[in-house]
Design a protein with these regions (language model features):
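Beta-strand elements within well-structured catalytic alpha/beta cores of enzymes
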Residues: 86-93, 190, 244-254
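Extracytoplasmic, non-cytosolic globular domains
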Residues: 227-235, 247, 254-258
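Flexible, D/E/H-enriched segments
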Residues: 1-83, 105-230, 241, 260-344
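Nuclease catalytic cores that cleave nucleic-acid phosphodiester bonds
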Residues: 224, 237-248
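Active-site microenvironments of hydrolase-like enzyme catalytic domains
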Residues: 88, 92-111, 255-256
Length: 344
């Protein structure tokens, strides 16, 4: 009998590195030649940002940030193990990994038989590792088929086009197995084109400072929060009538400093994230479904679109969060949100 567990985590890339490098994105953004002089040194930063930076360029704060994130990842893994899913469907962004110039779908279900990837070098675990996980092609094909029947023209793939596995998915697996006890659950990656107008123009990454990307060079936009909310609802509806126990997992941070131009790419739009966090906590689905693509871009929240899928799924399931956490920061690039919502 079908059961669904709803989860949300961050796949924050610097977590797999060492604490003394956790603030490397901020350091890169400080090289922006257009940065106001007052912001080039901590003396001109907001006071909480200076405090988090400290006198060690954020190393001590990085240890605390890591402890907060790993604590939530451990709680999420415990919920996953207690649920014992038949597979884990992960909504994650593709940052110029398989969505490249040859094809950029709005979203794509990876119906892989096997999922293989390697850990990044110089990682916190001290060794290079290869991962080989089962996919769940049967479930992925059924989901794609029924989404099409419900009016969502879902792209699908039987093998990766460029990158073996995007980091939103690889990091989710590595972080949920942070203590290296093993992760054997079949995985169905569900990639979302969160980066939209900058997925090719900016290669889904950090801003470029040696030239200006004109409006004419920008790409077509990402799917709207409304469309992805409805996609998540349809996904939950389809899987609720399936024979499987499924964990639905959103994998991403929220506002990213390097996408938030109004903050000079130095810190995330935490107030905007707080508003959406409160709406998720309160099951205010209208706020999520009516959120605009323009607001997403203005606040550097491109990756929150993964969570729009999760919000839609929770709405369809009439599911309330059981546990939630908001880990904020000024110097570590992004707000991180965690959610656990088991069957009631």
């Amino acid at each position: 009998m079908a059961e669904i567990l709803a989860l949300g985590i961050s796949h924050y890339p610097p977590l797999h590195g060492h604490d003394d490098r956790m603030a490397w994105i901020l350091k890169r953004m400080l090289q922006n030649p257009k940065l106001p002089d007052t912001l080039r040194t901590p003396a001109g930063w907001p006071e909480p940002m200076r405090a988090e930076w400290g006198n060690d360029e954020g190393a001590a704060s990085a240890a605390r940030h890591r402890a907060d994130l790993v604590g939530w990842l451990d709680r999420t893994r415990a919920a996953l193990d207690a649920f014992k899913p038949d597979f884990v469907l992960i909504w994650g962004d593709d940052q110029y990994e398989n969505f490249r110039e040859d094809v950029v779908p709005p979203y794509c279900i990876a119906a892989y038989d096997r999922i293989q990837f390697t850990s990044p070098s110089t990682n916190i675990w001290g060794k290079d590792e290869g991962f080989d996980l089962p996919g769940h092609r049967t479930a992925a094909k059924r989901l794609a088929s029924e989404l099409i029947e419900e009016g969502f023209d879902a792209a699908y793939a039987y093998k990766p086009l460029h990158n073996p596995l995007g980091h939103a998915f690889a990091n989710a697996v590595m972080y949920l197995d942070y203590h290296r006890k093993g992760f054997d659950y079949p995985v169905v990656p569900f990639a979302i084109n969160c980066y939209g107008r900058r997925v090719l123009a900016q290669r889904g990454g950090l801003p470029v400072f040696d030239r200006t990307i004109s409006d004419a060079e920008l790409d077509p936009p990402a799917p709207t929060p409304r469309r992805l909310f409805d996609l998540g609802a349809a996904t939950a509806r389809i899987l609720a009538r399936s024979p499987w126990r499924v964990a639905l997992l959103a994998s991403s941070g929220w506002s990213h400093a390097f996408l938030t131009a109004k903050n000079h790419f130095l810190w995330p739009d935490t107030p905007a994230d707080r508003r959406m966090y409160e709406a998720l906590r309160d099951c205010d689905w209208q706020t999520w479904r009516s959120y605009s693509g323009a607001a997403v871009e203005d606040s550097g929240q491109q990756e929150i679109l993964n969570w729009a899928c999760l919000a839609g799924a929770m709405s369809e399931l009439k599911r309330k969060p059981k546990e939630m956490g908001f880990v904020d920061t000024w110097i570590f690039n992004s707000s991180k949100v965690f959610l656990i919502a088991p069957p009631q």
